[in-house]
Amino acid sequence: TKLKLTEDEFYEKMEMLIRWYETKCFEGKIRYYGIAFEFMVEEPFENKWHIEIERIKNIARKVSGEKNHFKYILFEYHIMCDWADTVKSQMIDGVKMTMIEACKALELETVASMPFAMGDGFKKYALSDMLDFVSKKMNHVIVGSKNPKHIEEILRCWRGNLSECSGRQRFSGTDLVEI
């Protein structure tokens, strides 16, 4: 968290980290990198979590120009936690935006974590409904489950065997699912 740092100290440390990642990209060890937000989407205005992604993108531009390798923003997003699409917590060029809108404006790809609300979503929603919800707004979705039956169902649904899914709707729009 930023709790023990001033704003300037935090962004100075981010610049050091971005320089390190850009070096690894230049060396061919990685192609792209990003940042993951733990509670920022749930508590978007809490100073200890809040990060201006435009400022991070500007640091990447300062370090490596427009062809920098800062590409991904990962955050919690699911049918029971839609704040990334409903709360205008980011400022881009003086305009208030949601996290998802800001990522799009900065040409950053969004990665949804916890699309099943840590399993709580299964108590209220069908798998296909939860996948459909996240895939409409996100570029990528990281899925997983401790339950082998859920993993099997996820794979069947994602491959298009909708008759085997527990839900009614078809999900679409997401380029990648990583399991």
Model-based region annotation:
Residues 1-179:
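Beta/alpha (TIM)-barrel catalytic core signal, keyed to glycine-rich beta->alpha loops juxtaposed to Asp/Glu
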